[in-house]
UniProtKB/Swiss-Prot annotation:
Catalytic activity: [[Fe-S] cluster scaffold protein carrying a second [4Fe-4S](2+) cluster] + N(6)-octanoyl-L-lysyl-[protein] + 2 oxidized [2Fe-2S]-[ferredoxin] + 2 S-adenosyl-L-methionine + 4 H(+) = [[Fe-S] cluster scaffold protein] + N(6)-[(R)-dihydrolipoyl]-L-lysyl-[protein] + 4 Fe(3+) + 2 hydrogen sulfide + 2 5'-deoxyadenosine + 2 L-methionine + 2 reduced [2Fe-2S]-[ferredoxin]
Name the record gives this protein: Lipoyl synthase
Gene name tied to this protein: lipA
Native species: Rickettsia felis (strain ATCC VR-1525 / URRWXCal2) (Rickettsia azadi)
Family the UniProt entry places it in: Belongs to the radical SAM superfamily. Lipoyl synthase family.
The UniProt record lists the keyword Iron: yes
Subcellular location: Cytoplasm
Cofactor remark from the record: Binds 2 [4Fe-4S] clusters per subunit. One cluster is coordinated with 3 cysteines and an exchangeable S-adenosyl-L-methionine.
GO cellular component terms given for this protein: cytoplasm
Pfam families: LIAS_N (PF16881), Radical_SAM (PF04055)
Database matches in NCBIfam families: lipA (TIGR00510), PRK05481.1 (NF004019), PRK12928.1 (NF009544)
Phylogenetic classification of the source organism: Bacteria, Pseudomonadati, Pseudomonadota, Alphaproteobacteria, Rickettsiales
Length: 301
C-alpha cells in the first residue's frame, strides 16, 4: 500500500480565520470543553466553527483504544468530571444552538462505557435549552450490558454510531472493536426507541473494495439505520494508517446513488463528509424526508 502524500485539490480547505471561528474557540476554551473538531483534526473545523457549530467530546480527551485512523490521544483516562454535563448545557445555551452533537472517547474502563454520562448531558441540555435537538455519536459500548437501554431511555433525537470501515479491515484499522457488535448496537437502539433517528458512517480510501462498501450498506439497512455518511479517510500523522486511495467526487456520487436505492432516509457521501458535518441542516432534511415517506402517518412524538 503506497503512501499518498499529496492531497488532491478536491479535499483542500482554507485555513480558518473568521471572527466567528475565534469566538467559538474562546467560548469552548473558557468552559473547559473538549471537541472532536480539534482532537481529531477535522478538516471542516473552520467552516463549522464560523457557523457556531461544534461537536463536543465528553468523557475526557484520552481514549482507551488505539484505532489506526484516529488522532485522539490514547492512554489511561482521567476520572469523570461530574460538572461536565452542566458546562456543556451552558455552552449550548450561550451559543444558542438549534442542534448539538455530542461525542466521546471510548471508555472501556467504565462499567457502562460512559452511557450514564451521555444521559446526564442530554438531561441537562433539555433543562436549559428545551428546543435544541440533540445528536449523540457514541462508542460501541462493547461488553457493557445495559448501555443501550440507558441511551435509548435518554431519548436523543439522533443516535449515531459509526461502523467506520468494512469488516475485513477491522483487525488492522479498528482492532478493539467488533463489526457485528456495532450493527447490533444500532439495531437495538432502533428496537428500543423507534422514534430515535439512527445514523452511521464509514471512511473510504483505506483499501476496501466497492463490493464491501455495498455490503456494509445492506448490513446497516438490515439494522434499520436511517442515515448513512461516507467520507474520505485522511491520514492524521505518519504513525496512522496510510491512505490507500483518494476516492474521486464522481466515485462518491456513485456510492451515494447506490446507497439511496437501499432505502436510507438520508445519504451524505462526499470527500469531506464527516459524521457531524452539516448536522443541523441534515437533521432538518432527515425530518422532511421522513414526513415525505410517511406522509399519512403522524410524526413520532
Amino acid at each position: 500500500m503506497s503512501n499518498l502524500n499529496k492531497r488532491p485539490d478536491w479535499i483542500k480547505v482554507k485555513a480558518p480565520n473568521s471572527a466567528e471561528y475565534y469566538n467559538t474557540k474562546d467560548l469552548i476554551k473558557n468552559l473547559r470543553l473538549n471537541t472532536v473538531c480539534e482532537e481529531a483534526a477535522c478538516p471542516n473545523i473552520g467552516e463549522c466553527w464560523s457557523k457556531k457549530h461544534a461537536t463536543v467530546m465528553i468523557l475526557g480527551s484520552v481514549c482507551t483504544r488505539a484505532c489506526r485512523f484516529c488522532n485522539v490521544k490514547t492512554g489511561r483516562p482521567d476520572l469523570l468530571d461530574p460538572h461536565e454535563p452542566q458546562r456543556l448545557a451552558e455552552a449550548v445555551q450561550k451559543l444558542n444552538l438549534k442542534h448539538v452533537v455530542i461525542t466521546s472517547v471510548d471508555r472501556d474502563d467504565l462499567d457502562d462505557g460512559g452511557a450514564t454520562h451521555f444521559a446526564e448531558c442530554i438531561s441537562e441540555i433539555r433543562k436549559s435549552s428545551p428546543n435544541t435537538t440533540i445528536e449523540i455519536l457514541t462508542p460501541d459500548f462493547l461488553r457493557k450490558e445495559g448501555a443501550a437501554e440507558i441511551i435509548a431511555n435518554a431519548k436523543p433525537d439522533v443516535f449515531n454510531h459509526n461502523v467506520e470501515t468494512v469488516p475485513s479491515l477491522y483487525k488492522t484499522i479498528r482492532p478493539g472493536a467488533r463489526y457485528y457488535n456495532s450493527l447490533s448496537l444500532l439495531h437495538n437502539i432502533k428496537k428500543l426507541s423507534p422514534e430515535i433517528f439512527t445514523k452511521s458512517g464509514m471512511m473510504v480510501g483505506l483499501g476496501e473494495e466497492i463490493s464491501e462498501v455495498i455490503q456494509v450498506m445492506d448490513d446497516l439497512r438490515e439494522a434499520k439505520v436511517d442515515f448513512l455518511t461516507i467520507g474520505q479517510y485522511l491520514q492524521p500523522t505518519k504513525n496512522h494508517a496510510e491512505v490507500a486511495k483518494y476516492v474521486t467526487p464522481e466515485e462518491f456520487k456513485y456510492l451515494e446513488r447506490i446507497a439511496r436505492t437501499k432505502g436510507f432516509l438520508m445519504v451524505s457521501a462526499t470527500p469531506l463528509t464527516r459524521s457531524s458535518y452539516h448536522a443541523d441542516e441534515d437533521f432538518q432534511k432527515l425530518k422532511e424526508n421522513y414526513q415525505q415517506r410517511h406522509c399519512e402517518e403522524a410524526w413520532p412524538a
